């Protein structure tokens, strides 16, 4: 029995990659220094994986920004607008990631989307010229040879041709048709080069196969691989899936020329049933994904061994594997000195998951009962308490009316118009303002008890004053307090709610250099005291203008945390919803007129198969949001915000959240969402982001005016809010002030024309 992993986290044990790239962005290091830091990290990771006793060690899973972009660049799928900048390869790569504004031109970044049902974001490759598609990159070969120099025969990992093709945004059908042929030839050439290098295994990741597949999808997949697998020669090909099961294509895969199939037995609800029904091919190896790559709890060896024994009825050719890439979990628990050992023993991050694979391999390869198995089972005895009877009783007492806000949206809109007295096209921001080094230092000093609560509060109050003043000078209509007290929109609430645990170094990559530290939902959740009330009251006291209360919604708190596995996601979410509801009512009672409840991650846990959307998710996720705000008065305006996702297919459900205003991150997706809003007669007022805050470029007044005009062409003017597409926390003040001034100027200019 051997073992394998799909991919390893690339950010480093202490986010070394993030800091190295950010230094390069700030011109504080050279290209050579950045590339050396990246290589050092790769070497460290390979040696770590090798030391842990992993047999199939991945290469080419490392990325400076995003692995989908890496695959696109490998095959020269680069839009002409980036080619025309005439930058070197690295800066062209980063121009696609972040946009570019300089002497060579001014271009926006590629659109960003959620990677399937995770909190990782990938960049959407754009193809306007299929003629240039060819194998022009060499990253996959270089990194294989780097590992080879260390004495490691690695397994290069690459996004498969079918998934890559489905993720590309093509200019038109003609481009798409030509791209199909060119991309196939490029993959064939890739196979040839890997054969020249005498590579043993290539892993092709095809997560798109876990979606509901149409007949056309299956035909396209077969068309690609029937040709491609004829060119594999000595190269062995592992078809790797994750985030679900292969129910639509599994029997066909058994008859294909793949040498191995990677199945997900964690999220693949039907993976085991498929093997039981159809068996497994004698000429193939089964890479069994049984170590959870998306959650942080210790593997129960009894369950894993039971699964393996069942699979061995159908095949003896089994490799122990992770369910997906380990980039979705933190690096290692060895940096967690503050967590009680009773909790920590039940956590397994990426490095610990390597040990689990090693243990399972050893247990399966030994003839008698192994002490490793006994030690694992001991961990699950004396688990710390998780239940709170008061929370259970409160959930039990909920009635149908607790999930419905009255009066209707239409009636509320009239009441709010009279009460709030806002101008046409009201301007606002999403919530956070830049967090400079002194803000972070102040928070850290308070956490480390180096300063008093009074000093901490006074510092933040001064920052809030400055933030309110800046917004008033710019001329925004609805203000925010800036969120200087918050490290992260989810972690902050988790820290102030009972039932959460926190790591010191549990960083996970969200996109590029952005990392998040998800809290752990350990027990029943409740609010023991107000969380944001004092900050909101203070901010509102500084201005005659409305200052929004800012909260994170229950679904986002759940989706951006590591969830419990002992109760349903529905129950966990409703517990959080009741806690946030208490905060909403406190804010309203304190005179806060607009309360924003962000559901940035609403789409994240949406099942990948449409048939499961309602029963497994939307039927409880939408009511949980309703539960948060159903108790407020008609005159209180409820806002929500949603991040990078595709929303067009769940807009009716979003409308059913019954918020008064919703802001979307729509700027990177070219405002295409507006057509759908118009088509379904979306009732909620909307603020489609008018510029992309994930890029350092400052949009001009003309550019913003054009965007606002586009929005006005699609939606009634009374329904529109003007705002950036996300919070401003990661930007510099000079960019923010310049961009917001242009936003207000453009809005005023348009108002005069209406």
Curated annotation (Swiss-Prot):
Residues the record lists as binding L-homocysteine: 430-432, 483, 598
Residues that bind 5-methyltetrahydropteroyltri-L-glutamate: 15-18, 114, 514-515, 560, 604
NCBIfam families for this protein: met_syn_B12ind, PRK05222.1
Single GO biological process annotation from the record: methionine biosynthetic process
Species of origin: Campylobacter jejuni (strain RM1221)
Catalytic activity, as annotated: 5-methyltetrahydropteroyltri-L-glutamate + L-homocysteine = tetrahydropteroyltri-L-glutamate + L-methionine
Binding site for Zn(2+): 641, 643, 665, 726
Record function comment: Catalyzes the transfer of a methyl group from 5-methyltetrahydrofolate to homocysteine resulting in methionine formation.
Cofactor: binding details: Binds 1 zinc ion per subunit.
Transcription regulation among keywords: no
Protein name: 5-methyltetrahydropteroyltriglutamate--homocysteine methyltransferase
Biological pathway: Amino-acid biosynthesis; L-methionine biosynthesis via de novo pathway; L-methionine from L-homocysteine (MetE route): step 1/1
Entry annotation: catalytic residues: 694 (proton donor)
This enzyme's EC code(s): 2.1.1.14
Keywords associated with the record: Amino-acid biosynthesis, Metal-binding, Methionine biosynthesis, Methyltransferase, Repeat, Transferase, Zinc
Domain of life from the UniProt record: Bacteria
Obligatory cofactor(s): Zn(2+)
A Pfam family matched in the record: Meth_synt_2
């Amino acid at each position: 029995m051997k073992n394998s992993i799909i991919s390893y986290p690339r950010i480093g044990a202490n986010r070394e990659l993030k800091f190295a790239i950010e230094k390069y962005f700030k011109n504080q290091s050279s290209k050579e220094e950045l590339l050396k830091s990246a290589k050092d990290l790769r070497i460290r990771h390979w040696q770590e994986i090798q030391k842990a006793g992993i047999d199939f060690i991945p290469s080419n899973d490392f990325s400076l920004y995003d692995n989908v972009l890496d695959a696109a660049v490998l095959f020269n799928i680069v839009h002409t607008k980036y080619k025309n900048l005439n930058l070197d390869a690295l800066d062209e790569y980063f121009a696609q990631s972040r946009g570019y504004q300089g002497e060579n031109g001014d271009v926006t970044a590629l659109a960003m989307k959620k990677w399937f049902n995770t909190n990782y974001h990938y960049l959407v490759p754009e193809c306007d010229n299929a003629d240039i598609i060819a194998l022009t990159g060499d990253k996959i070969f270089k990194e294989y040879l780097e590992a080879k120099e260390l004495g490691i025969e690695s397994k290069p990992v690459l996004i498969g041709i079918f998934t890559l093709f489905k993720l590309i945004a093509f200019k038109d059908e003609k481009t798409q048709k030509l791209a199909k042929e060119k991309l196939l030839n490029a993959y064939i050439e890739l196979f040839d080069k890997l054969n020249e290098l005498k590579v043993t295994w290539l892993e092709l990741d095809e997560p798109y196969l876990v979606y509901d597949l149409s007949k056309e999808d299956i035909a396209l997949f077969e068309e690609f691989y029937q040709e491609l697998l004829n060119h594999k020669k000595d190269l062995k090909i592992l078809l790797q899936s994750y985030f679900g099961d292969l129910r639509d294509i599994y029997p066909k895969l058994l008859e294909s020329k793949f040498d191995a199939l990677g199945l997900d037995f964690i999220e693949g609800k039907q993976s085991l049933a498929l093997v039981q029904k159809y068996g497994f091919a004698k000429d193939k190896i089964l890479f069994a994904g049984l170590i959870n790559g998306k959650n942080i709890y210790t593997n129960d060896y009894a369950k894993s061994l039971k699964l393996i024994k069942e699979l061995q009825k159908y095949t003896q050719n089994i490799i122990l594997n992770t369910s997906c890439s380990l980039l979705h979990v933190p690096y290692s628990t060895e940096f967690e000195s503050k967590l009680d050992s009773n909790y920590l023993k039940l956590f397994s991050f990426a490095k610990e998951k390597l040990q689990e694979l090693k243990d399972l391999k050893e247990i399966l390869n030994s003839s008698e009962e192994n002490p490793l198995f006994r030690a694992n089972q001991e961990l699950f005895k004396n688990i710390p308490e998780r239940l709170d009877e008061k929370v259970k009783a409160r959930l039990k007492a909920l009635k149908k009316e607790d999930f419905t806000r009255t009066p209707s949206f239409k009636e509320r809109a009239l009441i709010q118009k009279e009460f709030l007295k806002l101008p046409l096209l009201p301007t606002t921001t999403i919530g956070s303002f830049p967090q400079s080094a002194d803000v972070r230092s102040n928070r850290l000093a308070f956490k480390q008890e180096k300063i008093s609560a009074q000093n901490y509060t006074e510092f933040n109050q001064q920052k809030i004053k400055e933030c309110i003043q800046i917004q008033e000078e710019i001329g925004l209509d609805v203000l925010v307090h800036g969120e200087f007290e918050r490290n992260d929109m989810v972690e902050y609430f988790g820290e102030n709610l009972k039932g959460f645990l926190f790591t010191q170094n549990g960083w996970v990559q969200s996109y590029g250099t952005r990392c998040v530290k998800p809290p752990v939902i350990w027990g029943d959740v409740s609010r023991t005291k107000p969380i944001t009330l004092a900050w909101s009251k203070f901010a509102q006291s500084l201005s005659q203008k409305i200052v929004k209360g800012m909260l994170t919604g229950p679904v986002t708190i759940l989706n951006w945390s590591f969830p419990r596995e002992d109760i349903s996601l529905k129950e966990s979410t409703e517990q959080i919803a009741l806690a946030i509801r208490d905060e909403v009512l406190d804010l309203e009672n304190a005179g806060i007129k607009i309360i924003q409840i962000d559901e940035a991650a609403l789409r994240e846990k949406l099942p990948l198969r449409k048939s499961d959307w309602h029963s497994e998710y939307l039927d409880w996720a939408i009511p949980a949001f309703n539960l948060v705000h159903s108790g407020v008065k008609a005159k209180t305006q409820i806002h929500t915000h949603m991040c990078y996702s595709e929303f067009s297919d769940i807009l009716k459900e979003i409308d059913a959240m019954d918020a008064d205003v919703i802001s979307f991150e729509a700027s990177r997706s070219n405002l295409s969402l507006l057509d759908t809003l118009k088509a379904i007669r979306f009732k909620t007022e909307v603020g489609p982001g008018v510029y992309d805050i994930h890029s350092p470029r400052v949009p001009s007044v003309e550019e913003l005016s054009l965007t606002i005009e586009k929005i006005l062409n699609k939606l009634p003017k009374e329904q529109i809010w003007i705002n950036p597409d996300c919070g401003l926390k990661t930007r510099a003040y000079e960019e923010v002030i310049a961009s917001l001034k242009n936003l207000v100027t453009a809005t005023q200019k348009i108002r005069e024309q209406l």
